[in-house]
Every structure is written in C-alpha cells, then in structure tokens.
Swiss-Prot record:
Ranges in a coiled coil: none
Metabolic or biological pathway, per its Swiss-Prot or TrEMBL entry: Carbohydrate biosynthesis; 3-deoxy-D-manno-octulosonate biosynthesis; 3-deoxy-D-manno-octulosonate from D-ribulose 5-phosphate: step 2/3; Bacterial outer membrane biogenesis; lipopolysaccharide biosynthesis
MF annotations from Gene Ontology: 3-deoxy-8-phosphooctulonate synthase activity
Protein name, entry field: 2-dehydro-3-deoxyphosphooctonate aldolase
Pfam families recorded: DAHP_synth_1 (PF00793)
Enzyme Commission numbers on file: 2.5.1.55
Keywords, ordered alphabetically: Cytoplasm, Lipopolysaccharide biosynthesis, Transferase
Assigned GO CC terms: cytoplasm
Family per similarity comment: Belongs to the KdsA family.
Protein localization: Cytoplasm
Gene source species: Acinetobacter baumannii (strain SDF)
GO BP terms, alphabetized: keto-3-deoxy-D-manno-octulosonic acid biosynthetic process
Amino acid sequence: MSQLKPQEVVRLGDIQMANHLPFVLFGGMNVLESKDLAFEIAETYIDICKRLDIPYVFKASFDKANRSSLHSFRGPGLEKGIEWLGDIKKHFNVPIITDVHEPYQAAPVAEVADIIQLPAFLSRQTDLVEAMAKTQAIINIKKAQFLAPHEMRHILHKCLEVGNDKLILCERGSAFGYNNLVVDMLGFDIMKEMNVPVFFDVTHALQTPGGRSDSAGGRRAQITTLARAGMATGLAGLFLESHPDPDKAKCDGPSALRLSQLEPFLAQLKELDTLVKGFKKLDTH
C-alpha cells in the first residue's frame, strides 16, 4: 500500500482546486463537433468566467466511445482532436481537460491536456487507471453510475500506488432503475472525507441513459435545481456542458445548458458558493 496521500489542494498554474476554496469550472462542450464551434464556445466561457471571476478550464471530448448506436456521431478522433484542443489552449491561453478511453491514449493526450479525465464507465479498468496515473497529469475521476461513493477510495489508491497524488473525484449520478440517474447529496461528503477536491458533473447527472431508444435523453429544464443543490454542499468545482442550440447538438443535447443562459446560471452558482463557504462549520457528530 502506498504511503502517498492525495493532495487536498490540487494546483494548476494559478488555479487552486479544493472543497473550501471558491469553485472552479470545468466547462465547454460535450464533443468536438467542429473547430469553429469549439472556439466559439471556449471564447464565450472565457469571457463570462473573467467577468464573474470564476477559475476556468475548457472541456471537450475528441471521441465519444460509448454511444448507444454505431451510427452516432463520435467526434474528430484522437489525432485531430488533440490538434484542435492544442489550438484552443494556445489561442486563448486556457487550460484543457479531456477524457481518455484506452491506455495508449493517455501519454499523447497528457501532452496537451492539463487534466485528463477517467470516464465513469471505465473507472474500474486498472490498465487505463495505471496508464493515466503514470502521466503525472491531474486526473479527474468520474464516479461510475454503479459505484457507491465510498468505493471511489479504491480508484484513488490505484493512482497513489503508481505515484500520482493530483486527483479529483467527480459525481455524475447513480443508476436508479432503468433509464434514470439520481444524485445522492450525502455522497459528496463521503467523497470529501477522502481529502480530495470533489466536483459535480451536473450535465451528465441529468441524463436519462438510453431514454431516446438510440441515444441518451436528458432533463435540461432541471439543471438549475440540481446544480444549486449540489453546489450547496460546498464543492471544489462544477463540470458543465453547453451548446448554442442544444436541440441540434450531436451528443447529449438534452442535458446541455443553452449557451445564452450560461452567464446568469453561473452568476447564481457563484453567489451560492460564496454564501455556503462563508458559513461557520458546525460539528454535528
């Protein structure tokens, strides 16, 4: 067993991620649909986050490998996707987060991305976890829909034993019967007890997996309610996907926030985050 412990405060340049600090935003688009759209969404997020003083990391996937249908849009792929993400990083001087699906992808992705993401469905795959941890990049570990919050400790230990202590846990909902996800608010505190920054992926928590027969459905209208509830627990950050026209998005549009609503949405969460983290901590044991 490794003696290494996870970092309570994970640092990325000037950005500090911790449950007691102002929240950090991992935001952008679900999948890279086109380079022009990626630039448009990145610029919108960056401008709004500067106005609201929210630390920001741009998110987009180069491949959606777990689509419901063989005919569903997956993205530009590894080579072109890394190129586009690198262009966004250089043009806007913004840090990048993207997901990795197979062990061979970890090293080349980590050369561009500042944070590499372990997908929820793959979070128990030891070879993938080990390959990602060996890059020494910050790792955002999505909690699988089929795992209890306390089970995330095992994935942290795998990373620590490889020598990587720059770890983040991210809630994205738990399976509740068929085609449904729920978020257990008590799970946030359970994961925070592991002394790692905890994020909330409100976008994918709104999914109804397989709810549209050949693709996932979603409950976009409930995004504000769920985001407020999650952020009220006092978290290190929020994971959010947006689109100018969610109904025309090529992946997970039903769960995406309309880009025109981004600023008022984030302004509310910023105010809530400041309020909650200003409360005196109560000992209720």
